[in-house]
Amino acid sequence: MSWIPFKIGQPKKQIVSKTVERDFEREYGKLQQLEEQTKRLQKDMKKSTDADLAMSKSAVKISLDLLSNPLCEQDQDFLRMVTALDTAMKRMDAFNQEKVNQIQKTVIEPLKKFGSIFPSLNMAVKRREQALQDYGRLQAKVEKYEEKEKTGPVLAKLHQAREELRPVREDFEAKNKQLLDEMPRFYNSRLDYFQPSFESLIRAQVIYYSEMHKIFGDLTQQLDQPGHSDEHRERENETKLSELRALSIVADD
């Protein structure tokens, strides 16, 4: 975070070293980047799970629409095929829902909780900035009296200004030290915090796709006809389509 330089009552004496400023900028910059990455990851994970659910729900709807097709009443082979498809789609949807629930619980919610910490952290940085501005203002006040002729009234005001400065300086130094100590610790903790979540994400995906392999393997065995390759089915479709195009009701004028 880059604070606004003091324009009114700016002290001549540098109250924060360039090294400290650079260290603070570096550590806070890393946390700002982490905050943005956490928000983006949470948003992308939510979009991904929503898309997964929409996909499986659409697949179930398609199979139900096919079951209501009049062909199922006229052709038992077609009914058997569509029934097998409907069963597979419902199984897929059930496993998909389990996967999404697991990801919501072990990935998205932890991301949300982690992200909820950043507003407090940003507020602590703002309090540090305010303390720095107060420190600079009072330091400039002390310097003003130090430059004046040392008369009785001036010395009294100088003493008072120094008394006002001391607790403000100590407050800033305490806030600054706390942030410089804790910001790196917070940043480094991200690995330990997120590792269980990402392990859970991988497990959920592995379980889901293992089940999908079984489901669609079973479906393939039920639907496969010996000697019917994809090329054979494509030729059959083209033949049927040519027959339909030959009908007078669809023939070109």
From Swiss-Prot:
Q: Which PROSITE patterns match?
A: BAR (PS51021)
| Subcellular localization(s) per the UniProt record | Cytoplasm, Cytoskeleton
Checking CDD domains in the record gives: BAR_Bin3
UniProt cross-references to SUPFAM superfamilies, sorted A to Z: BAR/IMD domain-like
Q: Which GO terms describe its cellular component?
A: actin cytoskeleton; cytoplasm
Mind listing the GO biological process terms from this record? actin cortical patch localization; cell division; endocytosis; myoblast migration involved in skeletal muscle regeneration; plasma membrane tubulation; protein localization; regulation of lamellipodium assembly; skeletal muscle fiber development
Highest rank taxon of the organism: Eukaryota
Among InterPro entries, the record links this protein to:
AH/BAR_dom_sf (IPR027267), BAR_dom (IPR004148), BIN3/RVS161-like (IPR046982), Bin3_BAR (IPR037428)
Q: Which UniProt keywords apply?
A: Cell cycle, Cell division, Coiled coil, Cytoplasm, Cytoskeleton, Septation
Give start and end of each BAR domain: 9-232
- Record-linked Pfam families: BAR
Q: Indicate the segments annotated as coiled coil, or none if absent.
A: 16-57, 120-151
What job does this protein perform?
Answer: Involved in cytokinesis and septation where it has a role in the localization of F-actin.
Protein name per its UniProtKB record: Bridging integrator 3
The organism named in the record is Rattus norvegicus (Rat)
Q: Gene encoding this chain?
A: Bin3
